Every structure is written in structure tokens, then in C-alpha cells.
């Protein structure tokens, strides 16, 4: 419960709802585990494929899109990134001939990111090692019921935060 008290200025300030020891343990385990997992996945992808997790995710989303292309705004939403950060990542992928940008023919204003044949080849080459790293460092450590709980919990977190971030 939040405790409310007045400051000397007369302004009312709410006391923070501090985490219980159990809540703090869960939060820290999540933060530490997530950081270590993403570091391990990034390391594997960079070592084996010269890709980051963010770049891999871009290639995956483009590979799943009709005509292997998406508007930059849709792609930014899909990878949960700012448009400026995505533009930087797309430039790096363009330099490696994995992605190309085109003007959207529908309105002539939007920009499409399109996965090239080289990008698809690199994704297909990177995928087996990446999936193995995901299995080894995450999936295989959990029982099916735990995976369901994680999917439910983070689906809910994503949905709630998504309602307010946009």
C-alpha cells in the first residue's frame, strides 16, 4: 500500500511501494538472467555469424513478411526499436548487402526495408547455431509448464506496457 505524507512545502508525496524480499529476488533474478542470456546470445551470433541479436531479429521479421519487405515504421514496431536506431541498424545490414531500402510504391513517401537473397542466406546460415544457443541457454533449462508461465507472464507485461507506450 502507498503511504502519503505532506512535505514542508505542503505538497503531498506518495511513499514508494518498496519490493518485498520475494519480489526483489524475482526481479533481480529476471534482470540478471535476462542480461546474461542476451549477452550469451549476442556473443554466439557475433562469433559465428557477425550479427547482433537485434540484426538477427530484423532479418527474421523481414524473412517472415510478404515479399520479404516491411515499412520501416512497421519494422521498428516489430523489433521494439526507435526509428533512428533501426535506421542505423539497417545501414549496417545494407553495407553487408543483406537488406536494401526502397520507396513504397503505394504512397511514394514511405520507405520499405527488403531482405535480399544474401540476407536470407546469412539468416539461414545463422539460424541453426542461434536456435541451439537459445535451447542450451533457455529452453532446455525449463519444464514445459515453466515455458507456458513465462509466455503468459511476458505476454501480459508486453501487452500492458504496449498500451501505454504508444
Model features per residue range: what roles?
Residues 1-49, 96, 148:
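N-terminal leader segment of winged-helix/HTH proteins
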Residues 2-5, 9-14, 91-149:
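Charged, amphipathic alpha-helical coiled-coil/dimerization segments
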Residues 22, 54-56, 146:
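N-terminal positioning helix adjacent to the helix-turn-helix/winged-helix DNA-binding module
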Residues 31, 60-67, 127, 155:
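Short, locally clustered residues in the helix-turn-helix/winged-helix DNA-binding domain
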Residues 39-84, 166:
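N-terminal helix-turn-helix DNA-binding core of bacterial DNA-binding proteins
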Residues 72, 90-91:
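Short, hydrophobic-biased segments on the C-terminal half of alpha helices
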Residues 146-166:
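Exposed, interaction-prone assembly regions rather than primary DNA-binding/catalytic cores
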Amino acid at each position: 500500500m502507498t503511504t502519503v505524507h505532506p512535505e514542508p512545502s505542503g505538497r503531498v508525496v506518495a511513499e514508494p511501494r518498496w519490493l518485498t524480499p520475494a519480489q526483489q529476488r524475482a526481479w533481480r533474478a529476471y534482470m540478471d538472467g535476462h542480461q546474461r542470456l542476451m549477452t550469451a546470445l549476442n556473443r554466439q551470433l557475433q562469433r559465428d555469424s557477425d550479427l547482433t541479436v537485434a540484426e538477427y531479429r530484423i532479418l527474421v521479421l523481414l524473412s517472415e513478411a510478404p515479399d520479404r519487405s516491411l515499412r520501416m515504421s512497421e519494422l521498428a514496431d516489430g523489433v521494439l526499436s526507435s526509428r533512428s536506431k533501426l535506421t542505423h541498424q539497417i545501414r549496417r545490414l545494407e553495407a553487408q548487402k543483406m537488406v536494401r531500402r526502397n520507396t513504397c510504391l503505394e504512397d511514394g513517401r514511405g520507405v520499405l526495408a527488403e531482405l535480399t537473397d544474401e540476407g536470407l542466406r546469412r539468416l539461414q546460415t545463422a539460424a541453426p547455431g542461434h536456435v541451439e544457443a537459445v535451447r542450451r541457454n533457455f529452453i532446455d533449462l525449463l519444464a514445459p509448464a515453466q515455458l507456458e508461465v513465462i509466455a503468459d507472464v511476458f505476454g501480459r507485461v508486453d501487452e500492458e506496457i504496449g498500451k501505454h507506450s504508444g
